[in-house]
Design a protein with these regions (language model features):
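Intrinsically disordered, low-complexity segments enriched in small/polar residues
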Residues: 5, 16, 27, 51-52, ...
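Surface beta-strand/loop "capping" patches
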Residues: 202-228
Length: 319
């Protein structure tokens, strides 16, 4: 079906694509570079004693050496936050709970990858997750609900960036805690980027799905109930934003995008998503799950035109 090959998408990094950027965004980028320089000096200072033969007992955890931390801006506090959490909710720093990866600079602003991975041994089950791109016309990328079979959350997808922006993840745990992490990404023009395929072809193939069982053992390890496994779900859909023009004209394409997605296995929920057009064209989700021995995985999606897309994928049953 011509889908992108599976891999660790978070390695993508290249030059900034040609697109409109406001002076405010350039100012943000310059501020970020200053912060990066200060961070580099701080890390260097901490490592000097060890290099000079002094004590090396103190080492920064990997996630303390962030290359693209969020930058200050009014949009989250003044506009977006109220749509994500209640005013009285205390947002805790989530760096100890989850690892969140997004590129410093994206090669393609229409397909910016991100990965959310729960840190091992935290003892907290994440039940909900909201992904936000602060400066997008539709900032809330998606609201996810996770079933117990998702275990320690490990999920990847791709999003659009309209201008340079923070991307942040807010998660809720089973015990009632709310945590947030975020990164700043240099990418712009993704919400108005040209549709990659012929419109007639895009509409004709809309709703087609593919599920990859990511068995990295090459089939050498048989399935077993209780095992942690990985899969990649790919769905054909143009995810029209309403900001894209028909090729060769100034006529805008009407918005149309997937707004709900539900994945189940043997009748048990893996994850459910309510989303918007900030998700990239032809959505792709790589996720880990706990095998419950079921022989099938079901996917159901709906879009803003009321279309329903459903498919059942056979699985090798667990032992």
């Amino acid at each position: 079906m011509g889908y992108p090959s599976q891999g660790h998408l978070t390695t993508i990094s290249s030059t900034f694509p040609c697109s409109f950027v406001t002076k405010r965004q350039l100012k943000k980028g310059n501020a970020m570079m200053k912060r990066l320089a200060l961070s580099a000096l701080a890390v260097a200072a901490l490592t000097v004693p060890a290099l000079a033969g002094g004590s090396s007992a103190f080492t920064l955890p990997p996630y303390a050496q962030l290359q693209n931390p969020m930058i200050d801006g009014p949009t989250w506090d003044e506009v977006v936050r109220a749509d994500v959490v209640e005013d009285d909710v205390f947002l805790q720093d989530g760096e100890d709970l989850i690892s969140f990866d997004a590129p410093i600079t994206a090669f393609d602003a229409a397909t910016v990858p991100f990965t959310v991975s729960q840190r091992a041994g935290m003892g907290e089950r994440i039940t909900k997750m909201t992904v936000i791109v602060d400066e997008n016309p539709m900032p809330i990328v998606g609201e996810f609900e996770f079933g117990p079979l998702m275990g320690d959350i490990d999920i990847e997808s791709r999003v659009r960036f309209d201008v340079f922006s923070n991307i942040r993840v807010v998660v809720e745990t089973e015990t009632g805690g709310t945590y947030m992490v975020g990164r700043f990404v240099e990418a712009a023009g993704g919400c108005s980027a040209t549709v990659t395929r012929d419109l007639d072809v895009a509409l004709a193939t809309m709703g087609k799905m593919k599920l990859k069982d990511l068995d990295f053992s090459g089939g050498a390890t048989p399935r077993a109930s209780g095992d942690v496994r990985q899969a990649q779900l790919m769905i054909r859909h143009p995810m029209f934003t309403g900001m894209q023009a028909h090729k060769g004209t100034l006529n805008m394409i009407d918005p149309r995008f997937i707004e709900t997605l539900e994945v189940t296995m043997g009748g048990e929920l893996l994850f459910k998503m309510t989303g918007g057009f900030s998700i990239s064209e032809d959505p792709s989700f790589r996720f880990s799950y706990i095998d419950n021995g079921s022989q099938e995985m079901k996917v159901r999606a709906t879009d803003t035109d009321g279309a329903v897309f459903e498919q059942t994928f056979p699985l090798n049953p667990g032992a």
